[in-house]
Amino acid sequence: MKVNGKKALVFGGTSGIGLATAKELASLGAEVTAVSRNPEKAGDVPEGVTLRQCDVRDREAMSQLFQECAPFDILVSAATGGDRAIGPFLQMDMDGYQTSFDKLWGYANVVRFGTEHMSENGTIVLV
């Protein structure tokens, strides 16, 4: 995929896979906005990458962010929503289930609100 000159939003773009994705897209010439719940904890975000704060579980904030950043061509969701529920499904407690579903809602919010503001033939990547 050619990304030079494309506009990209990377949720979870300040650490881990999201940060690596933001760096790669920027190095290939994309205009990148890295979105994080906690941008103050951002890793080594490259120069030229814009940082924005937003929690993927907050629908109002997501809607506002997408309106402000539109239109864009590439949408990446690598946000975990914070806590992680790890373990066999039947051995998790109710908090673990809630954490898992919160993460799912985060992905749903990215896709639901993001597609309204994407350019035609845009690309979505869910990590």
Identify the role of each PLM range.
Residues 35-40, 56:
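N-terminal Rossmann-fold cofactor-binding loop
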Residues 14, 22:
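N-terminal Rossmann NAD(P)H-binding glycine-rich loop of SDR-like oxidoreductase domains
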Residues 11, 72-81, 126:
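Rossmann-fold scaffold of SDR-type NAD(P)-dependent oxidoreductases
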Residues 80-95:
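Conserved mid-core segment of classical short-chain dehydrogenase/reductases
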Residues 57-71:
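Conserved Rossmann-fold cofactor-binding substructure of NAD(P)-dependent oxidoreductases
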Residues 76, 100, 110-114:
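Hydrophobic positions on the long internal alpha-helix
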Residues 1-9:
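Flexible N-terminal pre-Rossmann segment of NAD(P)-dependent oxidoreductases
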Residues 46-60:
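Rossmann-fold cofactor-recognition segment
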